Amino acid sequence: MQRKLVVLFCLVLLAFAGLSVRLILINRDNGDSYKKQVLSQQQYSSTTIPYKRGEILDSKGTKLASSEKVYDLVLDIKQMNNKEDYVEPTIQALEDYFSIDGDQVRAYAQEHPDSQYYVLKKRMSYNEISDYQQMMADTSQKEYNQYVKGIWFEESYKRVYPNSSLASDVIGFTRTDGTGTYGLEEYYNDVLSGVNGRQYGYIDGDDNLQRTTEAAVDGYNVYSTIDATIQGIVEKYLKKYNDENKDSTREGNGAQDAACIVMDVHSGEVLAMASYPTFDLNDTRNPEALIGSKLIDVSGNSTDTVINEEIAASMKQEENNDLLVQNLNALWKNYCINSTYEPGSTMKPFVAAMGLEDGRLKGDESFECTGIIEIGGYKIRCHNYTNGAEGWLTIGESIERSCNVTLIRIAQVIGIDEFLKYMSEYNFGLKTNIDLAGEARTASLVFNSSTMGPTELATSSFGQGFNVTMIQMITGFCSLINGGYYYEPHMVSKITAADGSVVKNIEPRLLKQTISAETSEKIREYCVQVVEGANGTGKRAKPAGYRIGGKTGTAETVSASGTREKEDYVVSFLGYAPAEDPQIAIYVVLNRPNAREQDLETRKACIIAKNILTEVLPYLNIFMTQELTDEERAELEAMQIEIREQLSANAPASDVSGNDVSGNTTDTGGDPSAGDTTAGENSSAAQPAGDDPSTTGGDTANGAEADNPYVNSDGQLIDPTTGEVITEDSDGYDVPVSGILENGAAGDSGGDTQNPME
């Protein structure tokens, strides 16, 4: 028996020896290959580390667009199934902390037992995952959490817009892939975009498995020239106009488009740019924003049907997606740069400047208004024709009264060649190259030497027959009143890195001088007559206590069939302030206002400008130079009451616009409903740390709160000269803050209705 055991032991020993020899031989011949294979099997797949898209801020640092870290909830079913003891505790954790349907998880796990990437919930905020994170880190719950396996989070970024609809036309938004579309998001997409990082493993020269990480490079931040407070003021009054005029003479919005630009006349910086209707940047695909607009069919043609709640609701159905997209594309466009129209009588100061600069006019000439003038077989009326001929008018009086006949005579003195030369000098027919996506081309929409004859020259003198964009008009107008200096309009003042260091300062770019300082001075005088003259068409644009200049405009529109509309107009006011030392220009346009009396609507364009300037000028520390009339003082007192009511209703003192400038943040939790609005901006398979890695959204450095001299830190209305709190018994103060009444001086002549050719 003992011998048998010895023999068996020897045989086993020989077998082990033989196996060892075999292993040595295999290792000698194929060891490197097998070792690399084993090491390669040990390394993890390459992981992408997402970059953070740069922020868009206003000129004072208010966040207009930012990116927040979000988390996708992922379940590794294979890991959960490693032990039977893991399954139910893991599913229970999903139910308790994330409200996941446990039965749904069980069913999926049964069908896909080897799945390692089951996405249960997308784009959760850190707050939504923090309770689970704390539970897993809590050692006192070890008896429970040690059985929770396979739950992990994939990081990405979501684009958020803290002020929702504020400056939506200017900002634009991002698609689901993180690329910008429309506005600054599109134009500066390459600047705002960063470079994804990577975490990966490799085998080094010593056959060791190494891990390395290439950090993500975040995008640059873009500082806009937009002032959020001024932007909010502009948007408030555009909305107020719509609210007061929608459904007035026909169903629909107060105007097809209502828009405004405020620009620094000495730099081309855009301080505010807005149009109505607007949309929520956090919910760009919401069809409710279309209510009140005319329906655009699936072929892209405008119809007479007005979108109501029922039509908007039907657009949410999948079969109507093409219809929704057509109408949203129209909504997302920026009227101030994307749309063209005939400028009407706001063109008249440009024409006067042509003749003065060319030397064919001295400034002391008079021209006769005969009420009607015949050009090329067409009879063209003066807008005031119903009251008879205006008689002999100076150039200034022609601008003040907005007389078409005398402007035609001035254009005839200038001549076709010089007229076309200055049209190009003012940049009509050329893009301004503003740094926003989608500026319209107008080269084919203006006359040239082959297409302009006597009739075209005549109609061009009062702004009909050719098309412009709002940005062309206000940029050219700034050169008329700032001494002749034409600055390229721009929306961004600087670009910074994620650490705050300045990458690039964008300085004003002077392109040319359109007219001399002497001509510019005369044009300013003429524009002041429009507002202050006895027969001025722009008297309702005058803010209390200030002198300003400007020009009203009314132009007939052209229907889809090419005929002149007799009831639909474009009315506008183009002005500057203050008259003594121009600092800002303002341009208000109402496209096809919801009214029949176009003179009245020109007044309303003036009133919008007046209300905006009443708030903006004191905000910019531009003080009154005129004593208030009793009527003006009454208006300002009514405004003070309105502000007190807003304050008593707990309205944020800094929210002068009625928009979300006050720092109200959007709800960033959960899966957003914005469709293409927010972007995943790439993702990273990473388990977040216990601390909140980023808190980027929601804080808005309110320019109004920091700079408004009329509200103290407690939100109380104060006298800016004494600092005393104004009560119901106070006498008030002279400088307006917000929202004066719209009743201007009685007896205003209103706007100038553009005349059709008979």
What are the language-model segments listed below?
Residues 99-101, 361-362, 429, 623, ...:
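Short coil/loop linkers at secondary-structure junctions
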Residues 624-648:
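Short, highly charged C-terminal tails/helix-capping segments
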Residues 65, 71, 203-215, 258, ...:
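Beta-lactam-recognizing serine transpeptidase/beta-lactamase-like catalytic domain environment
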Residues 686, 703-704:
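Short helix-loop capping/hinge segments that flank enzyme active sites or metal/cofactor-binding pockets
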Residues 1-311, 340, 417-425, 543, ...:
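Periplasmic/cell-envelope proteins involved in peptidoglycan metabolism and beta-lactam response
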